[in-house]
């Protein structure tokens, strides 16, 4: 795992990259995707039940989405959502919220969670 410091000087981990072809198609910046230790702790705390059900930790959940997303949707404000969309139960979407940090040229993970597809489908599809 690539480690460094985020803009608040907290350790962060590179979890992937928004690839050039996808970024171009979605009109987004091609850049590394990073997550801070603080956000991993936040995800673990807020979504421990879901993570235990899946049998994975917060890092593995974020990495799973970064490696397997099949949609990008507009998030709130300037954020975007990387989404694994699949049919099934109430929580049939896995999503991470990313915000682009211009000064560091990275996409930072702000949260990751299972979501109801109805909420996600209301968001503009970018890719």
Where does each model-flagged region fall?
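Ribonuclease/tRNase effector modules and their secretory precursors
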Residues: 1-127
